[in-house]
Amino acid sequence: MEQIDFFARVLGHLGPVTVSDSLLTSVLVAGLLSAASAVLTRRRTALPDRVQVVLEGIVSACENAVRDVIPTAYREVTPFIMSLWLFLATANLISLVPGFDSPTRDLSVTSALAVLVFFSVHWFGIRQQGLSAYLKHYLTPNPVLLPFHLIGEITRTLALAIRLFGNMMSMELIGLLLLIIGGLFVPVPVLLLHVVEGLVQAYIFGILALVYIAGGIQSGPQQENHSP
């Protein structure tokens, strides 16, 4: 039976940095997406071809999804959320390529992504409201609730990391068990399950990040200004 590691396999060290298979795969995915973005954006024309039409449709769909949640700041948030979706979808599905494992089944990778979302929530919140106005929402409706606000920030970050890790790991285990039990009769259904689950998990992670960012942007005095 294939051994499934719950953490990254260490390949070596580059100075103080530990180089793991998950780190290399994550860098590879980011590099491929960056290169593809650079190539495809250079091909933009006034009369779009089929590829450009599809890409513009994807961008428009992502922008509309973000605008439905954050109508006041969707232009600033859309690039971040779309980057998350693209990275996670590619990272979740790269294990379909022989010789690669999905980096999102490594808890250190999902934790890094959750921490990125954590800081992004505060970054967008401070940009929209200002530092003092943003920090005030931690003291409302009563300063006594400050510890609970802080605990909530930490626990939802942990939950975001563990949820993605757990779902991707369970998908790998279920696929392996089905292959062991069914042999050659189940490869295609397992592949379809992997594709669907990988895309769904990428979408859910991005939506949760979007909701958290919306909460950071819309918290505090701004809500009072828009109330009748």
UniProtKB/Swiss-Prot annotation:
It is found in: Cell inner membrane. One of its GO terms (molecular function) is proton-transporting ATP synthase activity, rotational mechanism. It is a multi-pass membrane protein. The keyword Isomerase does not apply. Keywords: ATP synthesis, Cell inner membrane, Cell membrane, CF(0), Hydrogen ion transport, Ion transport, Membrane, Transmembrane, Transmembrane helix, Transport. InterPro entries: ATP_syn_F0_a_bact/chloroplast, ATP_synth_F0_asu, ATP_synth_F0_asu_AS, F0_ATP_A_sf. This is ATP synthase subunit a 2.
